[in-house]
């Protein structure tokens, strides 16, 4: 299923470093291909500033700092089947800093963040060890499809 992605950019600089619409469709499409049972394929991906990320993280998670990706799954009212998956808010500054700190290409880290966030929209989590192992294994598999190495390797 081809994802329907509303790509939003809330940045005024460095927009040429952001993933393209085609990148997003490929990465999200790979996640959805592994989940053929879902008919939810519409989402928004918003590239945000550190200030917006911090405000969202504070308001929705109680953590007063910017973070790499926030996932907001859509929960349809009972009896109202919609194709909406949810929203991702990705902080460009944090992703750039993390990629540099981890010595990985920015595009690879963006792929990881989009795949990670999309898995959260589908209900995956990493609160306990078992869930984390399952989610991380799937992330590794999906990233390998794009010739991207293990993001959790030391």
UniProtKB/Swiss-Prot annotation:
Cleavable signal peptide: none
Keyword Nucleotide-binding in annotation: no
GO terms of biological process kind: rRNA processing
Name what cofactor the protein needs: Zn(2+)
Could you say which residues bind Zn(2+) here?
A: 116, 120, 126
Query: PANTHER family, alphabetically?
Result: ENDORIBONUCLEASE YBEY, CHLOROPLASTIC (PTHR46986:SF1)
Family membership: Belongs to the endoribonuclease YbeY family.
Q: What is this protein called?
A: Endoribonuclease YbeY
Species of the source: Chromohalobacter salexigens (strain ATCC BAA-138 / DSM 3043 / CIP 106854 / NCIMB 13768 / 1H11)
Q: What is the lineage of its organism?
A: Bacteria, Pseudomonadati, Pseudomonadota, Gammaproteobacteria, Oceanospirillales
Q: Which gene encodes it?
A: ybeY
């Amino acid at each position: 299923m081809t994802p329907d992605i509303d790509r939003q950019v809330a940045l005024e600089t460095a927009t040429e470093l952001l993933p393209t619409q085609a990148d997003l469709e490929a990465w999200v499409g790979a996640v959805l291909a592994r989940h053929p049972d879902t008919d939810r394929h519409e989402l928004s991906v918003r590239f945000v500033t550190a200030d917006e990320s911090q405000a969202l993280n504070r308001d929705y998670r109680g953590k007063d700092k910017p973070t790499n990706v926030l996932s907001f799954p859509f929960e349809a009212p009972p009896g109202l089947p919609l194709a909406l998956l949810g929203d991702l808010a990705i902080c460009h500054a944090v992703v750039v800093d993390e990629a540099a700190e981890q010595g990985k290409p920015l595009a690879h880290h963006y792929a990881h963040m989009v795949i990670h966030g999309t898995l959260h929209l589908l209900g995956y989590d990493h609160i306990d060890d078992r869930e984390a192992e399952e989610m991380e294994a799937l992330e590794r598999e999906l990233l390998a499809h794009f010739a991207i190495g293990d993001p959790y390797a030391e």
